[in-house]
Amino acid sequence: MSLSVVILAAGKGTRMCSELPKVLHKIADKPMVQHVIDTVKSIGADSIHLIYGHGGQQLQEKISDGSLNWIKQAEQLGTGHAMQIALPHFKNDEKILMVYGDVPLLSEKTLTDLIAAQPPGGIGLLTVELDNPTGYGRIERMNGEVAGIVEQKDATVAQLSIKEVNTGILVADANDLSRWLPALSNENAAGEYYITDIIKMAHLEGRIISAVQPESATEVEGVNTRLQLANLERAYQLKKATELLLSGVMLRDPNRFDLRGTLTCGVDVEIDINVIIQGNVNLGNGVVIGANCILIDCDIAENAVIQANSIIEGSSIGARATIGPFARIRPQSVLKEEVHVGNFVEIKKSTLGNGTKCGHLSYIGDSTLGQRVNIGAGTITCNYDGVNKFHTHIGDDVFIGSDCQLIAPVTINNGATTGAGSTIMIDVPENALAIGRAKQRNINNWKRPTKK
């Protein structure tokens, strides 16, 4: 039997105090609803129906997924109403899984367990035990079997004491839903159509409702406020940090680590505090990442050391290289083995050959540097004329003196040296010394102006 998933994502999210639709607020730099979409895809959903309402245009612009079937809920009249408008899109011979776009941490395992637990002709229901169940629908049982769900607004004092609550996530057969959904009523305190009412309908028909619980209550927590969003962000990050620690990565403090993408690590990797990982990052064996670094879509080879407060984006760092502190490596840069880039150096769209050093206070952009090059402090590649970018080529074993300006396009050939303070505008031959600076002039008996 095929599986269709309905994601409820029509809520406005008033308590978020934001113009952004609630489900577009992010966990780990990814919209909550995208987390849900990715999870249901991972369990093999054959079709995904996304119920949208508030901010529908924004939602469709941000979630550009051609595999989704978008269904508009013009009026938000409850979860049952959302499923009623989705009903015409169901096939009779498929299972229907209903989830929420603002419950981002739901795991693949929990959903797989829920689907497997659904009895023939019955309902699989995800529930959770909470010490403080305020606000949730309570699970009513008869002789141990799930018999119904009563919402907080409609519950009696006795029912309010029940700790087992409904998460709102369930799976049922489409042919049964086609009978139950049209029979829903809005005669309740909220005047809404509750999907939970189908539980009682199924029970009255003698159908079995099988309840499954997640490994962690955090999985089924929804987001209505920014505080709840922040709490789930921390829960997500701590889970990822725990996975890394158990795999052998040394995190100095798992509470001060942010993974906002995918991280692959070799053995004996060390990561200090306040490191942020974005996109796809690969760290080789023995890599050390200092405090406060940001790594974005980069590859760092074995035994490289990235010192504190450095940013590396869209680049590759070779084995045994040392970067930072306070270095910035911008996209499309390739730093090969044993390269050293020191403090307050920016590298952009450049290649640095094996053993090349750029110690401090320099900008290298749109450049190719050979092996064993030394870049003196304060060196700038002047690559932009206000319209176009130009390339600088520096050969092997070149020594660039401090405070040089290299006016691109220019080539400095193997073994050449530039004198400190030079402005290099023409190509430099192999093994030549290039000096491009004004002759020093001394004015004797000079007196500085004095303040009056």
UniProtKB/Swiss-Prot annotation:
Entry GO terms, CC: cytoplasm; membrane
Leader sequence residues: none
Enzyme superclass (EC): transferase
Region N-acetyltransferase, residue ranges: 248-452
Pathway terms, separated by semicolons: Nucleotide-sugar biosynthesis; UDP-N-acetyl-alpha-D-glucosamine biosynthesis; N-acetyl-alpha-D-glucosamine 1-phosphate from alpha-D-glucosamine 6-phosphate (route II): step 2/2; Nucleotide-sugar biosynthesis; UDP-N-acetyl-alpha-D-glucosamine biosynthesis; UDP-N-acetyl-alpha-D-glucosamine from N-acetyl-alpha-D-glucosamine 1-phosphate: step 1/1; Bacterial outer membrane biogenesis; LPS lipid A biosynthesis
The EC number(s) this enzyme carries: 2.7.7.23, 2.3.1.157
Cellular compartments annotated: Cytoplasm
Location of region: Linker: 227-247
Residues engaged in binding UDP-N-acetyl-alpha-D-glucosamine: 8-11, 22, 73, 78-79, 100-102, 137, 151, 166, 224, 330, 348, 363, 374
Protein family according to the UniProt entry: In the N-terminal section; belongs to the N-acetylglucosamine-1-phosphate uridyltransferase family. In the C-terminal section; belongs to the transferase hexapeptide repeat family.
Assembly behavior: Homotrimer.
The protein, known as: Bifunctional protein GlmU
UniProt source species: Psychromonas ingrahamii (strain DSM 17664 / CCUG 51855 / 37)
Lineage start: Bacteria, Pseudomonadati, Pseudomonadota, Gammaproteobacteria, Alteromonadales
